[in-house]
Regions:
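Acidic Gly/Asp/Thr-rich repetitive segments characteristic of extracellular carbohydrate-active
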Residues: 50-85, 89, 127, 497, ...
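Predominantly extracellular beta-rich ligand-binding scaffolds that present long acidic/polar faces
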Residues: 92-97, 333-339, 351-472
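Parallel beta-helix/beta-solenoid
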Residues: 104, 109, 127-179, 207-218, ...
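Consensus "Asn ladder" position of solenoid repeat domains
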Residues: 141, 174, 209, 214, ...
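Surface beta-loop-beta hairpin patches that serve as ligand-binding interfaces in beta-rich domains
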Residues: 470-472, 479-516
């Protein structure tokens, strides 16, 4: 994924210029009227029922607000709750003016019985917009925006603009669907859920974010995306020495989300440090975008861990693979993930015109991924370890197990892996740089196989390779891969299945004893 994020072309503004801009904005702002005067905000809980008849609304449960605009005009008390009635449908943009504090977050959720309340963006650019706020939690809402298809738009946008550090964000139990946006990405791109840092005058970042238990389906372009204008450092090709500095967001967790039918990428992490992406399910991506998109990947981010995710249904070979270690990333770990039935393959490792390093891809499963196992792109890199993975290519599947596009040096240590090709089609290696080394791999029916000291070409006796994933990719008793690997420094103590890793380890992702 070397599509650049939006580049900042302006230098940091001076304080004087900022004051001029504020004065100009004030001089051009419309005069207040009775229609947009903030309402009484003495109550802590604001109730909303867009299906109720008009009357003397005051935000109480008996006289709830009936439009989102009424809520947007409120100056909310710190730690207020905005509760939408279950079974109701509100049209427009919800953009509350409020925030929470430690121990008293602002809550946006539902009340009553029945289906989740619906916010329909009706073709607006934003559906739920949380801007320059913190200590906020949103849950149990249905969010859709199919109007004006092809327009730039988002389902949920959490935005910090020249804010500093914003703390504590929780998005849980949201059903985001039919966000029919355009084909853009980045800080102003179209997405189901977008965390967006913008501006160039105040160093700004997110801290303590959890995005969990949401569904994101039928969205153009991005599923869940983190982007920032504060992303400048000389490790990616879009570095602007006059732009905002590098200010990574921290303590980000993306967990247990279900994504499907995405025009472009699934989950993309940029300008963060220490993000955890786990237990997410993605089925169907790169379906409508003209760009290059993959399932889950980091860009210009450090120490990102992707684990226990499952990705399938990637379309096209632009990029169309499940996972990607992209440029400007260091300390990336992909472990305990499953990939299957992706047209573009299993993995991309791509530095383009930037740098990457210290990446580990281990204890993952790939079944019937087409086109390539590992793909590299232009640009060189070092210190990438691909070990203890199991790749199975069945009937009708052809794959280049490692495909180097150029002769630029790509240092990949390919150790303790199992690669099995069965049925029609081929599995081959296309090595050009001299940087890929193999050791202790179990390679069956591969073509153009390089030297593989300590390895074997015997049948690894996979338990049921066409059955359930990942259970079918275990090893049967008598497998030549059992305890035939070589120890890898820094390995975890358990495998994808929860088995302890022995010494020596098995080849492949499964580290338990032979199954019957």
């Amino acid at each position: 994924m070397n599509i650049p994020l939006p580049r900042r072309s302006e230098a940091v503004r001076t304080a004087g210029a900022a004051l001029v801009a504020v004065a100009l904005a004030a001089s051009t702002a419309p005069a207040a009227s009775a229609a947009n005067t903030p309402r009484d905000t003495s109550r802590q809980v604001q109730y909303v029922d867009c299906g109720t008849a008009s009357g003397k609304e005051n935000g109480s449960r008996s006289r709830p607000w009936r439009t989102l605009d009424q809520v947007n005009r409120l100056e909310l008390k710190t730690g207020s709750s905005i509760l939408l009635k279950r079974g109701s449908r509100c049209t427009g943009t919800l953009a509350p003016d409020g925030s929470g504090r430690e121990g008293k977050p602002m809550v946006i959720g539902a009340y009553g019985q029945g289906a989740k309340p619906v916010i329909d963006g009706a073709g607006n650019a934003e559906t739920l917009l949380l801007k320059n706020t913190q200590w906020v939690e949103a849950s149990n809402l249905e969010i859709t925006n199919s109007g004006n298809p092809g327009r730039n738009k988002r389902g949920v946008r959490v935005q910090l603009q020249d804010f500093g550090t914003g703390t504590h964000y929780r998005l849980t139990g949201l059903d985001v669907h039919d966000i029919l946006g355009d084909d853009t990405k980045g800080t102003e791109g179209s997405a189901g859920i977008l965390f967006s840092v913008t501006g160039s005058t105040v160093p700004t970042r997110f801290d303590d974010v959890v995005v969990s238990g949401n569904t994101v389906r039928t969205v153009d372009r991005e599923g869940i995306y983190f982007a920032s204008t504060w992303n400048n450092r000389p490790v990616h090709g879009d570095f602007d020495p006059n732009g905002p500095a590098y200010v990574p967001s921290t303590r980000i967790v993306v967990r247990g989300n279900t994504l499907a039918d995405l025009g472009g990428d699934g989950i993309v992490i940029t300008a963060t440090d220490g993000t955890l992406v786990e237990h997410n399910r993605l089925d169907g991506f790169q379906r409508r975008s003209a760009g290059y998109n993959a399932g889950m990947w980091p860009w210009n981010a450090d120490n990102t861990v992707f684990q226990y995710n499952e990705v399938s249904g990637g379309e096209t070979t632009r990029d169309g693979m499940a996972y990607d270690v992209d440029e400007g990333t260091f300390g990336t770990v992909f472990q305990y993930n499953v990939s299957h039935d992706n047209a573009g393959g299993f993995f991309l490792v791509c530095t383009a015109t930037g740098k990457l390093g210290n990446a580990v891809i281990r204890y993952n499963i790939s079944r019937n991924d087409h086109f390539r196992g590992i793909e590299t792109c232009r640009g060189s890199f070092d210190d990438v370890r691909f070990h203890n993975n199991t790749i199975y290519a069945g009937e009708g599947v052809s794959q280049t197990v490692v495909n180097e596009n150029t002769t630029e040096k790509h240092e990949i240590a390919f150790d303790n892996n199992i690669v099995v090709k069965e049925g029609s089609g081929t599995a081959s290696f296309n090595l050009k740089s001299g940087g890929v080394t193999l050791s202790h791999n179990n390679l069956v029916n591969t073509v153009g196989t390089p030297a593989n000291p300590g390895g074997t070409t015997a049948d690894p006796l996979l338990s049921d390779p066409t059955g359930a994933v990942p259970l079918g990719l275990r090893l049967r008793s008598g497998s030549p891969a059992l305890r035939s690997g070589t120890p890898v420094p820094g390995s975890p103590d358990r495998d994808l299945y929860g088995n302890p890793v022995g010494n020596p380890p098995n080849m492949g992702a499964y580290q338990g004893p032979g199954t019957v």
